């Protein structure tokens, strides 16, 4: 299914119906859920903290097939990331692989029923203000996600792009049983290599794409993350790609040449990066499909158009 084409209501309803509960979480994640549940109990939005997480059965089955063939993957090169904007590009809804480098690769496409681009933008403004808000997104995995320039993020005189791009979120979250502390530096699509003309022609409604680094080495980007969202009839699609590790094309980002040695020092060899790719694929599938299940209702209760 093309990432930027028009989807019919039939496409969306078929995909939305085939949801299944996701029930396996590592022991540290189960313990985190109980702590998060206690912390959110007295918040006005506590009813949106939900234990059941449902994901598309088709996405689960694709991940169960094991790593993708390399010919079906994309690299973080400028040429490859711009393929996401081509009218005939087909984006599968889930998958992972280990690329030469080594580099972990994750791909996904998620449908948000009844969601608009405005709702999705609002979420990125609203949730960093409190850790408890962040836990709604993935109750078993999310710890906190404060924003470095919070005052700018909340400045209603600025556009969404002015508030987010050039800003950094400091995420603490479990990916599998590994607690990760990450700096997520949101950037203009063009700064990451996405072609401005293609982006406009694709009629993308927004991007929350970023470079990621380990919190204790913020000067070394170890990951490129691309999230492009587009409204369709009855909802919104989010097309995502994650690259974590070393690749020659990452050299366009200052400091990335140190990523390979830094990751190796932190215990990320080829086997660990392949495991990370799998765990990130599961994490992405769970968190965004879970967000899709409650975001329209949350926005109607707490959202403001200015955000």
Curated annotation (Swiss-Prot):
Its cofactor is Zn(2+). Its EC number is 3.7.1.24. Induction: Expression is induced by the GacS/GacA two-component system and repressed by the pathway-specific regulators PhlF and PhlH. Expression is not influenced by the substrate DAPG or the degradation product MAPG. GO terms for molecular function: hydrolase activity; metal ion binding. It is an enzyme of class 3 (hydrolase). Zn(2+) binds at residues 142, 173, 283, 287. Keywords: Hydrolase, Metal-binding, Zinc. Hydrolase that specifically degrades the potent antimicrobial compound 2,4-diacetylphloroglucinol (DAPG) to equimolar amounts of mildly toxic monoacetylphloroglucinol (MAPG) and acetate. Does not degrade other compounds with structures similar to DAPG, such as MAPG and triacetylphloroglucinol, suggesting strict substrate specificity. Degradation of DAPG to MAPG may provide an additional means of fine-tuning levels of this antibiotic or may help avoid accumulation of a metabolite that at high levels may become toxic to the producing bacterium. This is 2,4-diacetylphloroglucinol hydrolase.
């Amino acid at each position: 299914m093309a990432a930027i084409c028009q989807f019919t209501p039939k496409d969306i309803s078929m995909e939305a119906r085939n949801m299944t509960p996701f029930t396996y979480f590592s022991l540290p994640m189960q313990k985190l859920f109980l702590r998060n549940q206690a912390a959110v109990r007295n918040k006005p939005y506590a009813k949106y903290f939900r234990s059941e997480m449902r994901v598309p059965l088709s996405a689960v089955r694709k991940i169960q097939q094991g790593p993708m063939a390399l010919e079906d993957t994309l690299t973080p090169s400028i040429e490859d990331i711009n393929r996401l904007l081509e009218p005939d590009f087909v984006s599968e809804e889930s998958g992972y692989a280990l690329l030469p480098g080594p580099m972990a690769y994750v791909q996904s496409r998620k449908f948000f029923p009844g969601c608009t681009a405005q709702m999705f933008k609002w979420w990125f403004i609203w949730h960093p203000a409190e850790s408890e808000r962040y836990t709604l997104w993935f109750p078993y995995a999310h710890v906190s996600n404060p924003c470095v320039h919070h005052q700018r993020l909340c400045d209603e005189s600025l556009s969404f792009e002015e508030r987010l791009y050039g800003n950094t979120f400091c995420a603490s979250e479990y990916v599998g049983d590994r607690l990760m502390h990450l700096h997520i530096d949101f950037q203009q699509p063009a700064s990451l290599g996405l072609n401005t003309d293609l982006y406009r022609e694709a009629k993308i409604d927004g991007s929350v794409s970023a470079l990621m680094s380990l919190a204790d080495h913020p000067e070394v980007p170890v990951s490129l993350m691309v999230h492009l969202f587009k409204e369709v009839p009855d909802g919104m699609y989010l097309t995502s790609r994650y690259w974590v590790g070393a690749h020659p094309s990452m050299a366009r980002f200052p400091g990335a040449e140190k990523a390979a040695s830094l990751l190796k020092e932190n215990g990320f060899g080829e086997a660990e990066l392949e495991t990370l790719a799998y765990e990130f694929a599961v994490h992405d599938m769970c968190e965004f499909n879970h967000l899709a299940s409650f975001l329209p209702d949350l926005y109607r209760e707490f959202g403001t158009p200015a955000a």
